[in-house]
Amino acid sequence: MNRVFVLSPANCNGLRARWMLRKNSRSEIAQRLRGEGVSLGEVFSFLSALYFRGKLAYAQTFAEPPSNCPGILIITPTAGLMPDDTMIRLSKLHGFRRGRIHVKNRHYCSSLRRSARLLATQMGSDCELVLLGSLATGKYLDLLKPIFGSRLRVPQEFIGRGDMSRGGLLLRCVRENRELNYVAAETVTPLPSKSRRNQSHNVSNPTALPPSYDDSVL
């Protein structure tokens, strides 16, 4: 069966993003963002060096898209779904920083729904869409399930795992050429807010974390 992956984004307001977007940043990726541009997948892999990098590597290994359909798309705060190889510059990243991924953000919701409907048509009926992202809230599932129905799948192994654990799992699967088990998203129920708090990272001083800390949105 054909399979397309949709990935949740990296955090565009995290420590690494702020460091990269400084006017005096001399990093190679910051200079390219000011010039010819950088692919969206590479930018988000830099911002989230474990979780997003693991998602992208996994999707690149196991995507089997139908013809004339991208195999990997990334959810963005302001532009709906974008192929991972889309070239972006600083202005686009600044726009992402201003967007909020939340079901009450009408611009985020309308952009995602619009691009998801287009993807659903491109995919056809014999193709699965696998979400690599948070299952704990409705910010992705509530918007995608009505459009894709039974075609929307999620990794069974993601249920109950934190984002750092997922990143390591995905990279191991790539090394072992081992695919995860996918279940229908219709069977997944978002966790209540108390359970989500219990699963969150216990970080008392986030600003003290080193630059390698994984800035992911889940």
Outline where the language-model segments fall.
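Peripheral peptide segments
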Residues: 1-218
